[in-house]
Amino acid sequence: MERLCWGWWWHLGILCLMHWAAGDTGSKTKSCSEVKQVYLAKGFSLNGAPQSEISGEHLRICPQGYTCCTSEMEENFANISRVEFEAKLRESSASIQRLLTTQHRNFDSYFQDLLNTSERVLQERFPSQYGDLYSQNSKIFRDLYSELRQYYRGSGINLEEALIEFWSRLLERVFKAQHTQYSFSEEYMDCLVKQYEQLKPFGDTPREVKLKAARAFIAARSFVQGLNAAADVVRKANQVPMSTECARAVMKLVYCPHCRGHSSIKLCSNYCWNVMRGCLANQADLDSEWRNLIESLLLVADKFNGASNVENIVGAIHTKISEAITHMQENKELLTNKVFKICGTPKKTNKGSKSEERRRKGKATQEDKSAVATMDNLISDVKGILSDIQDYWVSLPSLFCTEKVTAGPGNEDKCWNGITKGRYMPEPMGSGLANQINNPEVDVDITKPDMTIRQQIMQLKIMTSRLRNAYNGNDVDFQDTSDDMSGSGSGDGCNEDLCGSGRKLSRETVIIQPATHAVPRQPNPGETGKGTRLSSWDLLICLVALLVAQCTRW
């Protein structure tokens, strides 16, 4: 029996040697050449970088299995992941701002060119058409264009009152020019102006200008203000700082697979989307009011097309003024009789009348209208851009989760899921803060929305309301609603909240990910070898123990 036991021991010894040899072959550590290449490419020194995998109990963000990253490497990767994330957001934000400001500048420049051209044509033509009537009263025309510009630029001028004031002053000047043989007191002029509505000295032109030009200016002003407000919202939303929880999640998403030895595999798509939707939850809450603003801008843009477009109205203000003066000149006798009947006959002077001569000179000259499609082109461009950026806020995660970096269909089991190479089990979260309550990747406090984002949501609502009023032809008071909001920045170094041992553990590091990913248990710090090798060794020890016990009995 003793010989039999020794035989068993001999065979077990051979088995142990074979197992050790097999274990030694399987325990050969992986090379860290790939992660070192990535690390070097990011501008870091390779001093201290391991040649092969080391135990990962020092890691604070990445899974604590075997790793190619030291504490310093993990910290550097964490910092660079934050920098790259914020840089990509800034780049996207700057691109949208450029689009909006370019459209704002193009429309604003063209609209003001129309107004400037109209005034220039008036200044060139009216001296020859109306002689002293214009030269002695040119200030009222300059004042009109000045007030139109101020209104368009957002001042508190009441456009309707400005137009009424212009027509009243023009009535006084033309009536005096037509009756130079009379002397008019201030009281007489007051009587004349008070009868303006009844007399209708300029025909229907003032009413037409009030309806069409006022609507054009209201729409144009609201449109440029809306474009400016949209760009301002994008700028301020970009100032929202990256949260600590987001920074950890992005590091784990982007660089932990390198530390884990999986540099060549892609990210699990749903994993990437969950990280980004958690990080960009506050920004996604802008979506609803942003869409309302874009839709309102598109509605107002439609006002610039058709027979009553801006080119036909703003660019022809001087023509309408000329038509009004001509109408009054051609109906001089009828108007004079009505005024004298209502206000009385004024005292005569020794001056003669040149009104007939000026009336003949003052025939309205229609300006040749060139077929310019510039406004149509501008509106077509801006409508296309507005439509393209309508879903900007909810599409931000797609900046990071592109086809280039995420695994496609058929590769769901061969992607980085936050712990290892394998399938990602959790469902993708929806967009917006409220949908992040169960986000397994980013610990989001849905009860504390970002105040900068809330302020921008309110600005979007205010601007949308103004645009809707403008679309309906209602004048609105535009004040500059922009304010200098400064977002808090992030310093250098991997702070305690991000990497420190005293950090608040999120769901991703405690419960959710290991349970839902359904991956094998990772070795704890201090364990040697891999899980499968340890299990075989434990089994061998058990066999030896059983044999010893049996031999003892024998």
UniProtKB/Swiss-Prot annotation:
Keywords: Cell membrane, Disulfide bond, Glycoprotein, GPI-anchor, Heparan sulfate, Lipoprotein, Membrane, Proteoglycan, Secreted, Signal. Residues 353-369 have a biased composition (Basic and acidic residues). One of its GO terms (cellular component) is plasma membrane. O-glycosylated with heparan sulfate side chains. Residues 346-369 are annotated as: Disordered. GO terms for biological process: regulation of signal transduction. InterPro entries: Glypican (IPR001863). It is found in: Cell membrane. It is a lipid-anchor; GPI-anchor. Residues 1-21 form the signal peptide. Glycans are attached at residues 79, 116, 486, 488, 490. Disulfide bonds join 32-68, 62-256, 69-259, 191-343, 246-279, 268-415, 272-401. Cell surface proteoglycan that bears heparan sulfate. Belongs to the glypican family. This is Glypican-1. It comes from Xenopus tropicalis. The gene is gpc1.
